């Protein structure tokens, strides 16, 4: 029996397995960043819902039933809206912080870069305007749809 030869094979096999694991992790890192960002957005929307009575009751464009491949376009419509506080005070500061967090860009994905056919998505102005409560519900629904598509 020759142990050193077997030991070399074991070490080589372990190195191959380890390098494959590292390569897989680095290739999926961008996708993980998107998933994490979408989960953060759900939390931000839930926090904003706590202040819905403090928001300016102005009607806002709120995409609904967004076509496939138009999710990011619809999300950017949500981001363009300026949620405003109806009164001054501590809640106004919190609302401003949360809306700034909503406006941060989503991480890029490989699927977005690979998409060659350009889908015609509706303009932001074409969406029905809704009060802040429904605006936030529709935003959360869109983010949940994006998470579901990301995981499938």
Curated annotation (Swiss-Prot):
The gene is IL21. It comes from Bos taurus. GO terms for biological process: cellular response to virus; germinal center B cell differentiation; positive regulation of cytokine production; positive regulation of immunoglobulin production; positive regulation of natural killer cell mediated cytotoxicity; T follicular helper cell differentiation. It comes from the Eukaryota. One of its GO terms (molecular function) is cytokine receptor binding. Belongs to the IL-15/IL-21 family. Keywords: Cytokine, Disulfide bond, Secreted, Signal. InterPro entries: 4_helix_cytokine-like_core, IL-15/IL-21_fam. This is Interleukin-21. Disulfide bonds join 70-121, 77-124. Residues 1-23 form the signal peptide. The lineage of its organism: Eukaryota, Metazoa, Chordata, Craniata, Vertebrata.
């Amino acid at each position: 029996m020759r142990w050193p030869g077997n030991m070399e094979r074991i070490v080589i096999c372990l190195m191959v397995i380890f390098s494959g694991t590292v390569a897989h992790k680095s290739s999926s890192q961008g996708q993980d960043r998107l998933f994490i960002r979408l989960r953060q957005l759900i939390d931000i929307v839930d926090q904003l819902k706590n202040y819905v009575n403090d928001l300016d009751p102005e009607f806002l464009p709120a995409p609904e039933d967004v076509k496939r491949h138009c999710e990011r376009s619809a999300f950017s419509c949500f981001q363009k809206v300026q949620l405003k506080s109806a009164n001054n005070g501590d809640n106004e500061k919190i609302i401003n912080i949360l809306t700034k967090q909503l406006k941060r860009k989503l991480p890029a994905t490989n699927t977005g870069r690979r998409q060659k056919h350009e889908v015609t998505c509706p303009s932001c102005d074409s969406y029905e305007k809704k009060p802040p409560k429904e605006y936030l519900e529709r935003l959360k629904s869109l983010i949940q749809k994006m998470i579901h598509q990301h995981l499938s």
